[in-house]
């Protein structure tokens, strides 16, 4: 008789990622307090589920997050993760529970404006990787630090201090099934990498998990280029700027890497709406710069 672990595994993952979202936000806020950031009362959130934005009266921070990056991989047991970004904002986002009609709409619009900030306004970002080990990477704008969950003591232990992504690499992480749909500059660069005719003269290999957290985590440790570029089918790519692209770009840049759409820095783009999508390439600075140079010469 064949037994399936799918229902129990999915239930476990759902519970686990909810716990880690709360844990990550608490850790980040505590760190912000320790580093003498402003007082925290309550926190507003925007996430990748159906409920776009939740704002509480008097909050000092806005947390944006992707609860379970790579959720389509759950059945296959492939690494998944959680992405979180935290922004600071003004005190003018207070919703009166007695308000009605246009007054509420105006106040809610102000709350949304407080959420739609460029990545340059991030005060903290983190991701948690759920794999053979549970890793947490955090930045407060002064380097990237990784922690591994030690199950024997039930605590996160510092495993990598002041992470620096190697400037050179020979690995790229992209879904090459879409190669024919990519922009010509990107195709030319990747073709050169595969053939060993790129700027480095080294032949690249492909390593693609299909989970942004998993691929970026490996890139931070070993070097490489992670990309989810736009193509003829999805011109703007598929990653969400506010709660995927910007927080992960903050982490990558703090580790000494580059993150771009190919034409502009991801961190400098102000979202126009919560689920706005953008193309992304990030990683080792010399390899990513080769892509940027190709676009600039187009």
Cite the ranges covered by each PLM segment.
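IMPase-like, lithium-sensitive Mg2+-dependent phosphomonoesterase catalytic core
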Residues: 1-18, 22-27, 32-298
